[in-house]
Amino acid sequence: LKVNSDKMIQPLYEVATSNAELKDQALARYIVLTKASAMNNDRKYMNYRKALEAKPSVGVQNAALTAIAATQNYQGMMLAAEYMDNEATAQAAANTVMQIATKHPEYYSAEVKALLEKVSATLNDGDAVYKRKDIEKFISENKARESHSIITELSAEEKAEGFELLFDGQNMDAWTGNLEAYQPVDGYMYVTASYGTTGNLYTKKEYADFVLRFEFCFDRDGVNNGVGIRTPMGVDAAYHGMEIQVLHHDAPIYAGLREYQVHGSVYGIIPAKRIKWGPLGEW
């Protein structure tokens, strides 16, 4: 019996992670159903990542890596790059990195250039010569962004003042909690409901007397987030601690906000002066 239904995707994953004998078979079907599903590309990427994290056979790993290419997802490109060092998965991984990177000039950076050069050196299939030429052409056309790096470092002054770097542009090592919804993308931390998960992100380390510096931008109307302080994990920071609003309050859905709900307010406690936002995408 073969069932073609999105409803079988999660049960297959549960079988794969609870039954070692059926893991490969279940994950192979899990990948096929995910690929054919109505999920958005971000959700599909999350499923392929979960399949890889379950450590299946090389064949299933290669199927997941190949499937990631169709998501055209930045995180997928970076995840696939990690599999280029394993000879058994190198070809599938290299092809996926190439198929994503060369279709997205906006992803290009010094780090992505290095990845593409590694892809060029890794590819060995019948079309490798043509693929290398495509990579060379892409790199040549995007020289203007070669100096752009996704890596962030503390300045000498910040180090002297005792600041700690919580996010360097590519890894989430300082964080715990909802690491599925908060993802490193092109040097910044990106969060969207389209990943299909909910919950808060927390620093692993607790801080008492601190200064937190960060920049942000909204990529769509009505974004609602916040910075929680003095809050336990696993609860609503706005009610069990303090939540400083990060809110695109110009959106029509927020027309009736009270003064202690606008951006910059400590929600329900300390009101902030309401500002007028600039265009979406402005930091």
Explain the meaning of each model-derived region.
Residues 2-3, 29-32, 67-70, 96-99, ...:
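Core register positions within helices of long alpha-helical scaffolds
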Residues 4-16, 38-52, 62, 73-84, ...:
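Amphipathic alpha-helical scaffolding segments comprising HEAT/armadillo-like alpha-solenoid repeats
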Residues 5, 18-20, 56-57, 85-89, ...:
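Short inter-helical turns and helix N-cap capping residues of alpha-solenoid HEAT/ARM repeat scaffolds
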Residues 19, 33-37, 86, 100-104:
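Glycine-centered coil turns and helix-coil junctions that link the paired helices
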Residues 22-25, 32-35, 95, 236, ...:
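Beta-propeller blade termini and top-face loops
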Residues 23, 27, 61, 77, ...:
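Residue-level detector of extended alpha-helical repeat arrays and alpha-solenoid scaffolds
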Residues 55, 74, 92, 122-123:
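Long beta-sheet-rich domains in secretory-pathway and surface-associated proteins
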Residues 146-283:
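Carbohydrate-interacting regions of secretory-pathway proteins
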